[in-house]
Design a protein with these regions (language model features):
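A compositional/biophysical signature of low hydrophobicity enriched in polar/charged and small residues
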Residues: 1-153
């Protein structure tokens, strides 16, 4: 908080009070570290799918599932979930230690939300994170590792 106060030319107490007010009305919530999932032997997966219209029952099911932390019990770590407008309605970014666990989570979601998910689903694994949590990857140049090596014939 001292650095923020210094950069904004405020007193620390004023900056602290603004932070508390923003926390109180949930303008800001949760303080997290950005984790390189690959360095802890996990793979990031992105699941996108279309849904039927949102109903109260569907919303209740989503809230119940997210507040019981059931995915954690299965070895899955939820990174982000968005309800969107566009080609897909739901975007879920999660990590798992292997493809079998990731696929099992995907199948579990399909089963739980079977009355709401339309057939279009897209499951991808992430090769490299360029920006995560609003932070540019400090090892950004590792993207060059993905460039195919061309060997002369």
């Amino acid at each position: 908080m001292s650095k923020i106060a210094e950069k904004t030319k405020m007193h620390r107490r004023t900056a602290w009070q603004i932070q508390k007010d923003l926390e109180k009305d949930n303008t800001i919530w949760g303080y997290t570290a950005v984790i390189d999932e690959q360095k802890i032997d996990r793979v990031i997966y992105v699941l996108q799918f279309k849904t039927k219209h949102l109903t109260k029952h569907f919303a209740d099911l989503i809230i119940q599932r997210l507040t019981t932390e059931q995915p954690v019990e299965k070895g899955v770590r939820i990174l982000d979930i968005y309800f969107m407008n566009g080609l897909y309605d739901v975007f879920i970014k999660y990590s798992a230690p292997d493809h079998a666990i990731a696929r099992n989570y995907y199948e579990t979601l399909r089963s739980i939300y079977r009355d709401y998910i339309l057939e279009t689903q897209l499951l991808s694994d992430v090769n490299f994170s360029l920006v995560q949590g609003g932070k540019v990857n400090p090892e950004l140049k590792k993207i060059y590792d993905l460039v195919p090596k061309i060997t002369p014939e």
